[in-house]
């Protein structure tokens, strides 16, 4: 099973829910080797520990969750099996990191987003290609694809060597409001999962993409642990609501304000 719930291993929330770290997919299967050319893996530079997923959005920029940030980190692109390196796999380091100028932290969970500029651009190859930002907002009821190297079992964790993928449904925001009483009223979050449970993002899926109808619509952010509980969907950052900010940063306007 694909567990992609995000448990930030450096945070302990004093809330009724736990944040999913950058982690895995429960209830899924190994991803097709050709379906995740945009999926990247974030590692801690000193310990070489896998931290989170991320998404390559052009040759020089990666989008991930803010809670995945570490002072020293590197990024693997074109990776499938953690222990087997493709000829075209690339490694890059963050040159610049961008968060919202109006927020010094990401305790407001709808702002759990980080834009990373790579120290050198990457070229498209057999296992590397960017995923475009969404042109339209997602629709409730859409079938979405979630993926990552997060744990595939919960609460006892099993971290796989290969990414797992699973299909989940984009649910009405009220479903997550019922599951998480302290959830912000904001609509810049997406609610996605399977009401019956059994399929979910989980620990160390954080930062990875949620793809709905072929468009990059969400970033794995947080959820309840153990993962994949009935009527407790996962929370994802709504990428569409941040496209103007992302495009402004990429264009060089680093003083741009975040959305209200």
Curated annotation (Swiss-Prot):
Purpose: Snake venom serine protease that may act in the hemostasis system of the prey.
Gene3D superfamilies: Trypsin-like serine proteases (2.40.10.10)
Record domain Peptidase S1: where: 25-251
Protein's recorded name: Snake venom serine protease salmobin
Coiled-coil annotated spans: none
Cysteine disulfide partners in this protein: 31-165, 52-68, 102-258, 144-212, 176-191, 202-227
Family named by the database record: Belongs to the peptidase S1 family. Snake venom subfamily.
Alphabetical GO biological process terms: proteolysis
Enzyme Commission code(s) on record: 3.4.21.-
Organism annotation: Gloydius halys
Presence of the UniProt keyword Signal in the record: yes
């Amino acid at each position: 099973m694909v567990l992609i719930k995000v448990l930030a291993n450096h945070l302990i929330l004093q809330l009724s829910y736990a944040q999913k770290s950058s982690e895995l997919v429960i209830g899924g299967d190994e991803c097709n080797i050709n379906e995740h050319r945009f999926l990247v893996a974030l590692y801690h530079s000193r310990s070489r520990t896998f931290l989170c997923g991320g998404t390559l959005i052009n040759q020089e920029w990666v989008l991930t969750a803010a809670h995945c940030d570490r002072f020293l980190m590197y990024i693997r692109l074109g990776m499938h099996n953690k222990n087997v390196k493709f000829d075209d796999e690339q490694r890059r380091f963050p040159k610049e990191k961008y968060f919202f100028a109006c927020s010094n932290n990401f305790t407001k969970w709808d702002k759990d987003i980080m834009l990373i500029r790579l120290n050198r651009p990457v070229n498209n190859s057999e296992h590397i290609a960017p995923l475009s930002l969404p042109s339209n907002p997602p629709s409730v009821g859409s079938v979405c694809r979630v993926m990552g190297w997060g744990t595939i079992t919960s609460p006892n964790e099993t971290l796989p060597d290969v990414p797992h993928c699973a299909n989940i449904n984009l649910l009405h925001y009220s479903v997550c409001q019922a599951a998480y009483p302290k959830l912000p009223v904001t609509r810049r979050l997406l609610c996605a999962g399977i009401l019956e449970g059994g399929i979910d993002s989980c620990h160390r899926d954080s930062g990875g993409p949620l793809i709905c109808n072929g468009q990059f619509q969400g970033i794995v952010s947080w959820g309840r642990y153990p993962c994949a509980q009935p009527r407790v969907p996962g929370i994802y950052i709504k990428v569409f609501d941040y496209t103007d900010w992302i495009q402004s940063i990429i264009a060089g306007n680093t003083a741009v304000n975040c959305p209200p």
